[in-house]
Curated annotation (Swiss-Prot):
Protein's name in the database: HIG1 domain family member 1B
Listed transmembrane segments: 29-46, 61-83
Organism: Mus musculus
Annotated GO CC locations: membrane
Lineage, uppermost ranks: Eukaryota, Metazoa, Chordata, Craniata, Vertebrata
InterPro entries: Hypoxia_induced_domain, RCF1
Membrane topology classification: Multi-pass membrane protein
Length: 98
């Protein structure tokens, strides 16, 4: 029987959560920016919930969701454009120099 039943330790070859997050951030840096943008927009819109005036709550929440999704989609599009630039334009210019 194990002494620490409630604790799970990853195998030696696997990364822990913080190392994996940092590695994924280096591979695609705009994903955390998109997530942070969604959280900031959602927090701001929920904070402004009191000052919504005569707008229904459901409409306010729908607008909040649309704004957060727009931020996430924008980050995804910027990430895709950066990846295309890195893989095609930058690589082609480096190959032409050699």
């Amino acid at each position: 029987m194990s002494a620490n039943k409630g604790w799970w330790v990853p195998p030696e070859g696997e990364d822990n959560l913080s190392k994996k997050f940092l590695r994924k951030t280096r591979e695609s840096p705009l994903v955390p920016i998109g997530v942070a943008g969604c959280l900031v927009i959602a927090a701001y819109r929920i904070y402004r919930l009191k000052a919504r005036g005569s707008t229904k709550l459901s409409i306010h929440l729908i607008h909040t969701r649309v704004a957060a999704q727009a931020c996430a989609v924008g980050a995804i599009m910027l990430g895709a454009m950066y990846t295309m630039y890195r893989d095609y334009i930058k690589r082609v210019s480096e190959d032409a120099e050699k």
